[in-house]
C-alpha cells in the first residue's frame, strides 16, 4: 500500500518495514512533518517495538505505561517528545533478578519486525525517584542500525482509581496496540504533587509543560473528584500531605523565582513545541488544575 502513512500498514500479518533505509526514510519524513528530532523518533519507534512485545507477552496485565511516552501518545509527537519508557509493575517483584527475567522473556516474544533487543545493564534507581525502581538499559538492532533504549520500572505507584486500557496509536503504522496505562487524573496528580512539594528545587520543566499541554487538550474530560482523590493518594504514598495546603504560596514562589524562569526559557529554546509559551501561561494552567482539584473536595 503506497502513499502516505499507509505504506507501513501491517499487511497479511507481516511488517512492511524491512530495511534500515526504509525505516530511516519514514522517520525522516515524520521528522519533517512533526518538526521532531529524527533520533528521538527512532528511539520512539524502538520503544513501540518493545511495547508491542509487552502487549503479546505473559506480563501484559502486569505492565502499566506511564511517564513521557504516555504523555506523548496523549498529546501527539509534535507536542511532546520523550527519550525513555517509564512503566510500573503490579503483582510482580521489582528487584534486579526478577526484572531481568521479565525483560528477557518479553524481548523474545516472536514478532516479524526484524528488531533484536540486547540487555546492556540493569540496576536499582538511586536518584530522586518517588517510588523504588529498576533502570534497564538495552540496545536494539534493526538491519544494522543500533539504537539505545532506557526503561525505568517502578512498583507501588498510587493509581487512582485504577489503571485503564489505552489504545496506543503506532507512529508509522495505521493501527494501535492495547496496553494498560495510568489514567489521566493520576498522570496530572503526580506532576502536581511534585511541583508543590519540590517547589523551586524541581528543575524538570517537562512537569510544568505536561500539565499545561494535557490541561489544554484534555482538561474538559477531567473528573475533579478523581483528580482530587489521585492527588491525595499520591501525596499519602509519598508522605507529603502536609505540603498540599501550601500550594498557592508555592505557585507564587515558583512563578516569581528567577532561576525557574531561566530554566523555562532554556526549555522553550530546546523544544520547538514550547517556544511560544510564556512562563506565566504555564503557571496559570497549573493554578487552574489545582482549582479543579479543590472542586473535587465537595463532590
Residue ranges and their predicted role:
Residues 2-63, 72-81, 85-299:
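Structured mid-to-C-terminal alpha-helical surface segments
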